């Protein structure tokens, strides 16, 4: 079963950056770690993306075969963890929890 996350997209367009949020679907078994990401707020303020400044973000690290991918997701690490954890089997939860 896949879970839905809201990903912060940052597209460099030369002198400006286009910042948006889009829905993505992730296999929860591929999630390696989830950490709160306070650096997003300062970046959004610097980029004048004030519509997202009052939101919380976390860094989600996922394993894809030979490589890992990090995304900035909307929500606290606890909120995203609860979403991921609710879709995992008990044996997979044990691995995620350490």
Regions found by a protein language model. Give the residues of each.
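Eukaryotic intrinsically disordered, low-complexity regulatory linkers and tails enriched in Ser/Thr/Pro
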Residues: 1-98
């Amino acid at each position: 079963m896949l879970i839905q996350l809201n990903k912060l997209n940052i597209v460099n367009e030369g002198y400006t950056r286009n910042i948006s949020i889009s829905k993505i679907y992730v296999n929860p078994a591929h999630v390696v770690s989830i950490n709160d990401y306070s650096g997003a707020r300062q970046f959004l303020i610097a980029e004048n993306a004030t519509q997202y400044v009052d939101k919380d973000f976390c860094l989600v690290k996922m394993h894809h075969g030979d490589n890992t991918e990090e995304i900035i997701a909307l929500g606290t690490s606890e909120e995203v963890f609860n979403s991921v954890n609710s879709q995992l089997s008990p044996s997979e939860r044990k691995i995620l929890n350490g």
